[in-house]
Curated annotation (Swiss-Prot):
Alphabetic keyword roster: Cytoplasm, Hydrolase, Protease, Serine protease
Organism: Coxiella burnetii (strain RSA 493 / Nine Mile phase I)
HAMAP family: ClpP
Subunit comment: Fourteen ClpP subunits assemble into 2 heptameric rings which stack back to back to give a disk-like structure with a central cavity, resembling the structure of eukaryotic proteasomes.
Function, in words: Cleaves peptides in various proteins in a process that requires ATP hydrolysis. Has a chymotrypsin-like activity. Plays a major role in the degradation of misfolded proteins.
InterPro entries: ClpP (IPR001907), ClpP/crotonase-like_dom_sf (IPR029045), ClpP/TepA (IPR023562), ClpP_Ser_AS (IPR018215)
Protein name: ATP-dependent Clp protease proteolytic subunit
Family annotation (PANTHER family): ATP-DEPENDENT CLP PROTEASE PROTEOLYTIC SUBUNIT (PTHR10381:SF70)
EC number of the protein: 3.4.21.92
SUPFAM superfamilies the UniProt entry points to: ClpP/crotonase (SSF52096)
Single GO MF descriptor: ATP-dependent peptidase activity
Cellular component terms per the entry's GO annotation: cytoplasm; endopeptidase Clp complex
Catalytic residues of the enzyme: 99 (nucleophile), 124
Chemical reaction(s) catalysed: Hydrolysis of proteins to small peptides in the presence of ATP and magnesium. alpha-casein is the usual test substrate. In the absence of ATP, only oligopeptides shorter than five residues are hydrolyzed (such as succinyl-Leu-Tyr-|-NHMec, and Leu-Tyr-Leu-|-Tyr-Trp, in which cleavage of the -Tyr-|-Leu- and -Tyr-|-Trp bonds also occurs)
Length: 195
């Protein structure tokens, strides 16, 4: 399926310049994470963050998230880059931030993590499905548990909740309204209008 990306035209001293909407917003330091978190999305988001850091290491990067989650390894690559780059990464949930999306939302700079009023946030444990020999399944189960523990530690760090509480809450799908996400410590505020 082909998707039409809107173009915007800007007047410059040298005439008109046409941009696709996402390139134009990137000039304003806005990155979109929309849809399943996977390797291609992670590659683009990481490249954009590194580019914006090289352009101005002292100006915030704005990460708009509308994601049902996805591949943990891709999410961890984005998360690690968010922590690695010098600029603060502001996060804003614009629809849903579930699973890996919630991890990225919470991983924004403290005081700069937000939701729009009708957004939804969901945390849960790592999902995995494996087949094969019993020993291979055991190996994958141990790896899944290790990654799950790692993600719970990250959520505990960013929310200020103790690890036991995070483990209990991520044991099943745990949905939060924006107000509940503020109380939990996943975000810092709800944007009801542009600040």
């Amino acid at each position: 399926m082909s998707v039409l990306v809107p173009m915007v035209v800007e007047q410059t001293s040298r005439g008109e310049r046409a941009y696709d909407i996402y390139s134009r917003l990137l000039k304003d330091r806005v990155i979109f994470l929309v849809g399943q978190v996977e390797d291609h999305m992670a590659n683009l988001a990481i490249a954009q963050m590194l580019f914006l850091e090289s352009e101005n290491p002292n100006k915030d990067i704005n990460l708009y998230i509308n994601s049902p989650g996805g591949a943990v390894t891709s999410a961890m690559a984005i998360y690690d880059t968010m922590q690695f780059v010098k600029p603060d990464v502001r996060t804003l949930c614009i629809g849903q931030a579930a699973s890996a999306g919630a991890l990225l939302l919470a991983g924004g700079a403290k005081g700069k993590r937000h939701c729009l009023p009708h957004s939804s946030v969901m945390i849960h444990q790592v999902l995995g499905g494996y087949q094969g020999q019993g020993t291979d399944i055991q190996i994958h189960a141990k790896q899944t548990q290790r990654v799950s523990d790692q993600l719970n530690q990250i959520l505990a760090k960013h929310t200020g909740k103790d690890i036991e509480r995070v483990e209990k809450d991520t044991n099943r799908d745990y949905f939060l309204t924006p107000e509940e996400a503020v109380e939990y410590g996943l975000i810092d505020s709800i944007f009801k209008e542009r600040p």
